[in-house]
């Protein structure tokens, strides 16, 4: 990803945890952290281990709830002019269920978690789809 492990750890873990502690964890706050698909403590990839540790440690803080969102592919939004990376292959997303969401679905799912809660603390692509239609 173009940075040292130390820099990545500082950016992804330390800054997030400092922010979470600085806002003063409160029992009525919901913290939503976007980690991404493939996040795992047992992964060989440093980014994945770091994101997983961040999710775990956020859950230990005294928030009402802390969710780790793990989106994967992002479908382009209507009218999007420039597609980079996997966005160029957005037509594949319709054929691979559980692989992608729209940015609108992710936003609605986050609002649903904050307003109504969710039984899973790790929210994957399919959960995002469900949550985006769930709590109004």
State what each model feature region is.
Residues 31-37, 69-71:
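SDR active-site strand-loop-helix element
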Residues 1-2, 37-41:
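A short, flexible beta-alpha/helix-coil linker loop
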Residues 24-25, 115:
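Residue-level signal for alpha-helix termini/capping positions
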Residues 26-29, 63-64:
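A short helix->loop->beta-strand "cap" motif at the edges of active sites that frequently abuts
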Residues 1-18, 22:
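NAD(P)H-binding glycine-rich loop region in Rossmannoid oxidoreductase-like domains
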Residues 17-21, 29-32, 52, 56:
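Internal, well-ordered alpha-helical scaffold/interface segments
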